[in-house]
Regions:
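Glycine- and hydrophobic-rich flexible loops that cap the catalytic core of alpha/beta enzyme folds
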Residues: 1-144
Length: 144
């Protein structure tokens, strides 16, 4: 599959985005989430400085376009799940097959709960305008 760039929001909205069974559990901690949110904040500042053509590459996501029609995340699972949690908080109507994914591993379940709670707490300290800037950045600035 050829390489291409996409906004993170567009990628997360793909109906067939999936995590293969062989992937390791979701292990990102609050510290990783804090670093991610800080990176996005810096990208927002840069976007305000350089204008609407500015894009920030949040990292590489490797996806396998499977014969069964699914887009399996091969690399970048931790980052993309974390960003999906941010989207879910900022936009409660947000739907992604990824956020509907059933995680059977107890470590994954606990880290997802803990990280969502951290995201919620982090954003309670932010203004509504800042929350909107974050959501806009995920749609327009942040790409993979």
């Amino acid at each position: 599959m050829p390489a291409y760039k996409s906004s993170i929001f567009d990628l997360l909205n793909k109906d067939n985005l999936a995590i293969p069974d062989y992937q390791r559990p979701y292990k990102w901690t609050k510290r990783n989430i804090e670093d991610l949110l800080t990176d996005i904040s810096k990208a927002i500042e840069e976007g305000q400085k350089f204008g609407e053509s500015y894009k920030y590459r949040i990292g590489t996501i490797l996806i396998h376009n499977s014969q069964d029609g699914n887009l399996y995340i091969v690399d970048g699972q931790q980052r993309i799940i974390s960003i999906a949690l941010v989207c879910l908080y900022l936009l409660p109507s947000f739907h992604s097959d990824l956020t509907d994914h059933y995680f059977s591993d107890d470590v994954s379940k606990q880290n997802i709960r803990d990280n969502y709670m951290f995201i919620r707490q982090w954003f309670t300290l932010q203004s509504d305008d800042e929350k909107k800037r974050f959501l806009d950045a995920l749609k327009d600035i942040i790409e993979v």
